[in-house]
UniProtKB/Swiss-Prot annotation:
Probably interacts with PlsX. GO terms for molecular function: acyl-phosphate glycerol-3-phosphate acyltransferase activity. It comes from Thermosynechococcus vestitus (strain NIES-2133 / IAM M-273 / BP-1). This is Glycerol-3-phosphate acyltransferase. One of its GO terms (biological process) is phospholipid biosynthetic process. Pathway: Lipid metabolism; phospholipid metabolism. Signal peptide: none annotated. It comes from the Bacteria. GO terms for cellular component: plasma membrane. Belongs to the PlsY family. Its main location: membrane. It is found in: Cell inner membrane. The keyword Cell inner membrane applies.
Amino acid sequence: MTTAVILGLLALISYLLGSIPTGYLLAKALRGIDIREHGSGSTGATNVLRVVGKGPGLVTFLVDVGKGLGAILVARWVLGQAWSPVPAGWFEFVLLAIAFIAVLAHSKPIWLGWRGGKSVATGLGVLLALNAPTALATFGVFLVVLAVSRIVSLSSMTAAIALPFWFWFFTQSWPFVGFSVIAGAFVIWRHQSNIQRLLAGTEPRLGASQG
């Protein structure tokens, strides 16, 4: 296979994994509802937790993390094979491109008319595969802010802002830092409605029935 074919297949696999609508499928199976018509309208773990329950919310979170993790692990395995024609010098940039495709796919799944989640859990999975210390430190920021504020959206956006600093601290890699700026900005952009509610003082805290 040519380099273009390999890269195209990796991009397709990453998109297909990232776009699996975990929360939507669970809500349909367990409650017979379209999760996008309830709560915040997101298919992500937080909305599933509020609308469907803690168990489904946790399952959604874990599967969504696994989607991001799996996309990078598959790409890393393929790129590391002797039969792969992709130049070794492209390795880092290909992984970062695959990572962003997985993040994008979670938010923009073709199966649901491009309406998905906010890519936080899938982004965490991607980070775990790219650089585990960065992932854990960023998740730590999320947990600290969540413990203080009990607002998931604020915690997610704060973690996204902290991400480039952690990537630089652990990797000193400008491509990784650049990726984190773009991916973090995308996650924050996906939280536009949450930002409006935060400014209005109406964003629900963890445990509320709506969000």
